[in-house]
C-alpha cells in the first residue's frame, strides 16, 4: 500500500479453530519504506500500535445498529482486542536517504485487515466478504 510517500506491507499468520470459529492472529509482520527515517524508535511504536488497532478492527470491532440507532455504545457491546489476544509483532523499517521523507503512522492499521483476510483465505480456502471476523460469522462461512 502506498500512503503519504511511504510503502507499507503486512503479513498475518493466523490460527483458525473450525469448531468454534475463533480466529487468532498469532504473528504479524509489518514493514515500511518511507524515505529517510528520523526517529526509528517512535516509528516502531507507531507501527506496532497500528497493528494492534488493525488486528482489533479485523477480528472484533463492529458498530451495530437496531432500527437505525447505534447499539454498540458501551465497551461491553463494542468489542476490542484484549492484551492476551495481541499477536507477536515484528516491525521492519527500510530507510532511504535518496527518497526524501514520508509518513509513518496510520498506514500500519490500514494494511492489517487485508492481511488478515488473505491469511484467512489461505488457511481455509474461503473468502470472507466482510469484517470483522467474529466466531459466529466464521462458523457460518466454514459450513459453506
Which stretches of residues belong to each language-model region?
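C-terminal catalytic domains of large/alpha subunits in multi-subunit enzymes
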Residues: 1-144
Amino acid at each position: 500500500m502506498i500512503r503519504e510517500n511511504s510503502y507499507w506491507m503486512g503479513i498475518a499468520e493466523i490460527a483458525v479453530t473450525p469448531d468454534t470459529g475463533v480466529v487468532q492472529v498469532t504473528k504479524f509482520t509489518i514493514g515500511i519504506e518511507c524515505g529517510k527515517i528520523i526517529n526509528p524508535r517512535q516509528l516502531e511504536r507507531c507501527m506496532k500500535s497500528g497493528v494492534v488497532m488493525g488486528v482489533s478492527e479485523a477480528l472484533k470491532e463492529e458498530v451495530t445498529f437496531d432500527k437505525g440507532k447505534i447499539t454498540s455504545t458501551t465497551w461491553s457491546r463494542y468489542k476490542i482486542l484484549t492484551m492476551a489476544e495481541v499477536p507477536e509483532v515484528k516491525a521492519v523499517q527500510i530507510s532511504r536517504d535518496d527518497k526524501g521523507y514520508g509518513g509513518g503512522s496510520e498506514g500500519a492499521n490500514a494494511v492489517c485487515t487485508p492481511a488478515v483476510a488473505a491469511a484467512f483465505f489461505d488457511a481455509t480456502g474461503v473468502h470472507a466478504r466482510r469484517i470483522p471476523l467474529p466466531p459466529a460469522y466464521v462458523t457460518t462461512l466454514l459450513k459453506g
